[in-house]
């Protein structure tokens, strides 16, 4: 069945994970350690959260890579026994989201890719475990917000990855069947979300948190980055006939 909609993950798929969320997370952890007057705990905190400083990579199954910013910050605040409660957590979530959104380094060329997909009649969506406002900020910086048909974050009311809700919401927004949707992402949770929703095609990229070895068993195809997506669509005759109608 031809693909009629492509739902992309954001971090590690469209933008450089290291430049955005890793940098913002390290800064947040350092700040929290300073608040706790425990700078010596920084290395332990980020290591236990899934960051390998020697390899400069995140564990692809960690909360930092797959979960929400709020869950990560809550874990750190709890481990450091910081006072401040909900106000501190929300303040640090907002700060980390803003830092990540201010450092947007595109992977391949999302703007050109999205324009070509739209010209072919495909609906384009972005589903992220970031807050929706953070996602929209990043997409604006990439210059693609105006051509994206659907954006959702962990707070948009469609559940979280690896559940099917984000894919199904994309389908509802664009009058698609799950079998007509290709999901593109860089983590096991992205691929598991695709399977849970019954998406037609699950494509993993190795430009983010996970290696091909981790992703291969969970998806239909592993590619290096989104720059290889169009040749894959062409080779497997997944392009639809040109048309662009969506409710």
List each model region and its residues.
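N-terminal helical cap/lid subdomain that shapes the substrate entry/recognition surface
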Residues: 3-111, 116-120
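Conserved phosphate-coupling serine/threonine residues in phosphotransfer and NTP-handling enzymes
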Residues: 13, 128-130
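Asp-based, Mg2+/Mn2+-dependent phosphohydrolase catalytic module
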Residues: 1-6, 19, 34, 111-119, ...
